[in-house]
Amino acid sequence: MKKPSILPLFLLLISGIWMSASTTLQVMDFPASLDAFERKGLVVMNDSALVLISSASGVEFRFAGDNCQVFLSNKAADEDYNYVSFELDGKYYGRMKVDNSISKPFAIQADSSAEWHTLKIFKATEAQNGLLLFHGVSADRVKATEKTNMLRLEFIGNSITCGMGNDVEETPCDNGKWYDQHNAYWSYAAIVSRALNADFLLSSISGAGIYRAWNSETPSVPSLYESAYLNADSLQKRDFNSFKPDWIIIALGTNDLSEGDGVNPRKAFDSARFINEYFQFLQTLISRQPQARFALLTSPMVEKEKDILFHSCLIAVQLKFAEIYPEKPKPEIHHFPAITATGCSGHPDKDEHQQMAESLKGFLVSVINQAQN
């Protein structure tokens, strides 16, 4: 008996796959490599996708019409996922979970009264949550936002700068995964940058400090800072020419001063080591960004005797800097007033991040104006 041919079925399957791929390509009208998509934060272009690495990294652009679709995918390890936040026409649009491993459209609905709309996309989670990929957009038309000579700020910090534990609208504290309440859009750093109309980059790692982590000796932020992916796994180095900050604002020390988790042995805070390694980190930053001024921040989470100790350490770093670099303007120091954090795991919530941003804004306006005079 003659065997039935499998060729028609094979051709049908191939045709179906091709049609599916073609449809996907037709739906995504504008790929991530397009110049209209202005890259923000710590990102790298990988094949046809833009990899969003650090907290608040993303893209911004303008689109015509009353809707667009943003194609994203999640490249976190195992069953982890990411979150993305959107800002549409200067207003917060919302946060969405990205747990799909292949490109998927996320719909954005705009007001039909305007021809053009500005969309900003922010990675709400952080580098250690894994990669978030931006593949492109479906829309009637897209174009770049208008370029302005913006102030450029880089914030180097820990979980507070990441926006950990500040957004409980979908997942209450003590529920879900440790990063389910992350929202870098509502970090004090992002808030104050928007208030100052500044372009900004967050180099922040939850749990890490100047010379140790909150409950262990590693990692430290300086040990990971020069990695393109803010981790110890990648050999790829960061491109320091892609973002040239006017000011580098450092908010590190909370985790160094931490008492730990009560399980692992914890040595007493070593102020001499903290001062020395903080200054060494400043030297690294000078070698990478010689044009930048520095601002050193205390923490509203550190109180009483520890706050006094922390502040005195920053003054010591400032004095050492002035001694070694007499030709450079000394780092400025901002002392945060104490805040009783009501977010998750002892972190500030969105309102408390707003308080921090207001405090920091007044300081930054003052020192920036002084630097310009």
Label each residue range with its predicted role:
Residues 251-256, 281-313:
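Active-site segments of SGNH/GDSL-like serine hydrolases
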Residues 152-156, 161, 200-204, 246-251, ...:
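Structural recognition of the beta-strand scaffold that forms the well-ordered cores
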Residues 2-5, 19-156, 160-181, 373:
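N-terminal secretory targeting modules
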Residues 8-17:
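Bacterial N-terminal signal peptides
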Residues 292-298, 306-345, 350-373:
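Extracellular serine-dependent O-acyl
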Residues 186, 190, 194, 276-283, ...:
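Solvent-exposed, polar/charged alpha-helical surfaces in well-ordered, non-transmembrane soluble domains
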Residues 54-56, 127-129, 172-268, 272, ...:
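Conserved SGNH/GDSL esterase-like catalytic core that processes O-acyl groups on lipids
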Residues 188-199, 281-293, 320-329:
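A structural motif corresponding to the C-terminal end of an alpha-helix
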